[in-house]
Amino acid sequence: MAVVGLGTDIAEIERVEKALSRSGEAFAQRILTDSEFEVFQQLKQKGRYLAKRFAAKEAASKALGTGIALGVTFHDFEISNDEHGKPVLSLHKKAREIADASGTKSIHLTISDERHYAVATVLLES
């Protein structure tokens, strides 16, 4: 296996919380897929969840080499958790096309947060 792409992002949780206060659920819906939004609606710490998803999707877009541009949107990335709580990244639409074209066979995602920040790293392997 060879590294196809690597991306990291950090998000300030308070900044995301302020954006949520200003824009309400519209901001969350711009970032989250439908299934992620369902989880979001049930949480007490919505800003923390959204900051972690935002950082993960930005990291994934950087690993692809596109950023959130060139036809790649936040909805092209979906984060879920396996039965042990490990984050799992799924690619859709344009992000999936680009990953397939680059020979990506394996996707690794790690997300962490503390009081002020959420950080994520994505590794794509062939």
From Swiss-Prot:
This protein's name: Holo-[acyl-carrier-protein] synthase
Organism listed in the record: Vibrio atlanticus (strain LGP32) (Vibrio splendidus (strain Mel32))
InterPro entries reported for this sequence: 4-PPantetheinyl_Trfase_dom, 4-PPantetheinyl_Trfase_dom_sf, ACPS, Ppantetheine-prot_Trfase_dom
SUPFAM superfamilies named in the record: 4'-phosphopantetheinyl transferase
Purpose: Transfers the 4'-phosphopantetheine moiety from coenzyme A to a Ser of acyl-carrier-protein.
GO process terms (BP): fatty acid biosynthetic process
Chief localisation class: cytoplasm
An annotated Gene Ontology molecular function: magnesium ion binding
EC number: 2.7.8.7
Gene responsible for this protein: acpS
